[in-house]
Amino acid sequence: FNKPLIAKIMYFLRILPMVRQRDGLRNVLKNHDTQEIIIETIENDVRFCMYPEGRHRPAHSLLPLGKGIFRAALAANAKFGESKPVYIVPTGIEYGDYFRYRSTSLVTFGKPLNVTEFIKGLDVENEAQMMEPLRKELSARMSELFSYLPDGEDLQDRWTLVKMMSV
């Protein structure tokens, strides 16, 4: 997104940047513009994809979910949640072989999480307090959608066992 031509193409395709604090505080302020585009997209009933982990690794586990997806959902809910509910659809992506080119993959969609209803049931007052229960719920739902193996020293051994048992 630092190259103007590439940035224009990415924005046209609705591939939007979410900047982290490690990229500099000045750059983090650009997330406000991205969030406005996301809210407008949701309000117009256009579906889009957001990767809440923000990165990947070749393991069948779930990385910590970033705040971006929750900030966007809560901002959209604050803007129009009374008239139209806001949903997050948990998705699991399972790779047949992470390192092999043209390997298989399986995309599984879970039951949509109605953010509007979920936060109504919370006894909290501010956005920061809403994020943690949302994060836990989405993490739990995503973990059910792929061969989830919790982090640990024997992660590779457990994955080998899962592959052997699936044959």
Give the predicted meaning of each segment.
Residues 1-126:
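Soluble catalytic domains of membrane acyltransferases
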Residues 125-167:
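Long, charge-rich alpha-helical interaction segments
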